């Protein structure tokens, strides 16, 4: 990690989930990253990810709890998902296609705007934490 950083945001795990990588492997990899950040003694924000139901309830349960647990373990600010603005009644809005780039995976400008609105309050907390350091 570069010296002199004021804070870190870790937003990983989505591609691991899409590849069906075991939650315990994802957790171990995240811990490796978080330990490096912990050694730097800088404020941390973790952005989580959710597994879909089609991986089975055990996988979903194990995967979904990785990020909130690690945020607690590492005293990090936490945002449950970049998808939060699109979750309705516990599931993703069925009209999501309008928010994706042509690849069907990555957000377009409209979605990025919604992400910024969602992440903004937690990000401001991170900025405040850096000024208190």
Predicted segments, located by residue:
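Alpha-helical cap/lid subdomain in secreted, periplasmic
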Residues: 1-133
């Amino acid at each position: 990690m570069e010296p002199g950083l004021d804070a870190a945001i870790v937003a990983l795990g989505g591609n691991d989930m899409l590849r069906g990588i075991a939650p315990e492997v994802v957790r171990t990899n995240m811990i490796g990253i978080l330990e490096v950040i912990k050694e730097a003694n800088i404020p941390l924000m973790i952005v989580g990810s959710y597994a879909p139901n089609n991986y089975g309830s055990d996988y979903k349960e194990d995967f979904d709890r990785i990020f909130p647990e690690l945020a607690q373990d590492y005293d990090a600010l936490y945002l449950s998902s970049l998808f939060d603005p699109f979750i309705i009644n516990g599931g993703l809005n069925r009209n999501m296609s309008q928010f994706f780039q042509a690849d069907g995976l990555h957000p377009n400008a409209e979605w990025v705007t919604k992400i910024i609105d969602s992440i903004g309050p937690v990000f401001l907390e991170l900025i405040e934490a850096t000024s208190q350091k």
